[in-house]
């Protein structure tokens, strides 16, 4: 006999609550509606989301797609009971990967999977996704909520995001004219962003701290809230600088793998990025992680962003103008180094000086 007292099993008896899913959809409709933009003004609930490239102003576009997740930063959100910002991280990780190719983010879809659906928790998560979409200027045109009993324990859940953007043909980055002597600018990160959290959690465990403990590196905040500071979204300032200065040659989103894995992805094989580590203003969270965990400088550089979330490559004569344009849009910009010649087989990122850890 089912839990409802009737003969025969129901989907609810198997752990899937369709009514909870419907309630979640109703809760998130205003947030989703708030992300509408030219090209996307439909309602959620259809079998697929629509986007009109002509209505968005494109004439001969190249589509650019990216997908990503939030990693084990989610575990902190789950354990701390703070779910309203990880959606911003989800969007940021995808749309920042689009803008580095010169593409304007247009649409976003999310995948939210959990063992037992909590409509309030889900609404908080999707509210963060919608906030990230508004900041990036892209429409949340659909998604999938999957309640899967037995697949996730306790209140665990996972998120994945999918973003599509576009650039007019011939305007994609990196440009083909990166040259020796070009200047490397760095845009400040908001914190750890969404990479390296397995190491972060290990360090916190070794320190014997709970997520509700005062953050040793952020006055007035709990450790959980401070570490959950959402990933910075660089889309609108970078798109404006790309269009107005026409001087950006390459961009690199500093994610997993840090400088040594991400910068070379946008460079020709004969050039390397020479970074003066002393020019980086290192946020206190990274100093705390390094000292508390005994993490060496090179390990920090290949695990975390260390205070720089985005790299910008420009010709030396345009560096000041590009920096000023980005600063006018609220970015904190530092001149980090320059492009140098690279021997075959040599690393694509080399360092001078030391980090201020």
UniProtKB/Swiss-Prot annotation:
Any one GO molecular-function label of the UniProt entry: phosphoribosylamine-glycine ligase activity
Cellular localization per UniProt: Cytoplasm
GO cellular component: cytosol
EC id: 6.3.3.1
InterPro entries found in the cross-reference section: PurM-like_C_dom, PurM-like_C_sf, PurM-like_N, PurM-like_N_sf, PurM_cligase
Chief localization: cytoplasm
Plastid in keyword set: no
Class of this enzyme: ligase
Pathway(s) annotated for this protein in UniProt: Purine metabolism; IMP biosynthesis via de novo pathway; 5-amino-1-(5-phospho-D-ribosyl)imidazole from N(2)-formyl-N(1)-(5-phospho-D-ribosyl)glycinamide: step 2/2
GO biological process, one term: adenine biosynthetic process
Record keyword Cytoplasm present: yes
Catalytic activity from the UniProt record: 2-formamido-N(1)-(5-O-phospho-beta-D-ribosyl)acetamidine + ATP = 5-amino-1-(5-phospho-beta-D-ribosyl)imidazole + ADP + phosphate + H(+)
Pfam annotation, one family: AIRS
Tree of life domain: Bacteria
Keywords from the named record: ATP-binding, Cytoplasm, Ligase, Nucleotide-binding, Purine biosynthesis
SUPFAM superfamilies (UniProt xref): PurM C-terminal domain-like, PurM N-terminal domain-like
Annotated family: Belongs to the AIR synthase family.
Protein name: Phosphoribosylformylglycinamidine cyclo-ligase
Organism of provenance: Allorhizobium ampelinum (strain ATCC BAA-846 / DSM 112012 / S4)
Designated gene of the protein: purM
């Amino acid at each position: 006999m089912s839990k409802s007292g009737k003969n025969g099993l129901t989907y609810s008896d198997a752990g899937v609550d369709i009514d909870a899913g419907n309630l979640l959809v109703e809760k998130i409709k205003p947030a989703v509606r708030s992300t509408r933009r030219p090209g996307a003004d439909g309602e959620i609930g259809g079998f697929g989301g629509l986007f009109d490239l002509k209505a968005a102003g494109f004439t001969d576009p190249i589509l650019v797609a990216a997908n990503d997740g939030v990693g084990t930063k989610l575990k902190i959100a789950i354990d701390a009971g703070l779910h309203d910002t990880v959606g911003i991280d989800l969007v940021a990780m995808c749309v920042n990967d689009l803008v580095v190719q010169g593409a304007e983010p247009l649409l976003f879809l999310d995948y939210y999977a959990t063992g037992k659906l909590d409509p309030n928790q889900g609404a908080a998560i999707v509210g963060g996704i919608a906030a990230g979409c508004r900041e990036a200027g892209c429409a949340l045109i659909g998604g999938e909520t999957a309640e899967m009993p037995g697949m996730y324990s306790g209140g665990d859940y996972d998120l994945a995001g999918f973003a599509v953007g576009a650039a007019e043909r011939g305007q994609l980055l990196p440009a083909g004219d990166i040259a020796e002597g070009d200047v490397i600018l760095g845009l400040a990160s908001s914190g750890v962003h969404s990479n390296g959290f397995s190491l972060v959690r290990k360090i916190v465990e070794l320190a014997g701290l709970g997520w509700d403990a005062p953050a040793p590196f952020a006055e007035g905040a709990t450790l959980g809230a401070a570490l959950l500071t959402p990933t910075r979204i660089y889309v609108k300032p970078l798109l404006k600088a790309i269009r107005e200065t026409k001087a950006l040659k390459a961009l690199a989103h500093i994610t997993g793998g840090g400088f040594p894995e991400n910068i070379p992805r946008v460079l020709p094989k004969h050039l390397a990025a020479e970074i003066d580590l002393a020019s980086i203003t290192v946020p206190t969270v990274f100093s705390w992680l390094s000292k508390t965990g005994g993490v060496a400088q090179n390990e920090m550089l290949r695990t975390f962003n260390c205070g720089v979330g985005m790299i910008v490559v420009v010709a030396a004569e345009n560096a000041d103008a590009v920096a000023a344009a980005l600063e006018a849009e609220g970015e904190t910009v530092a001149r980090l180094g320059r492009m140098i010649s690279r021997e075959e087989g040599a690393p694509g990122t080399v360092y001078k000086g030391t980090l201020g850890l």
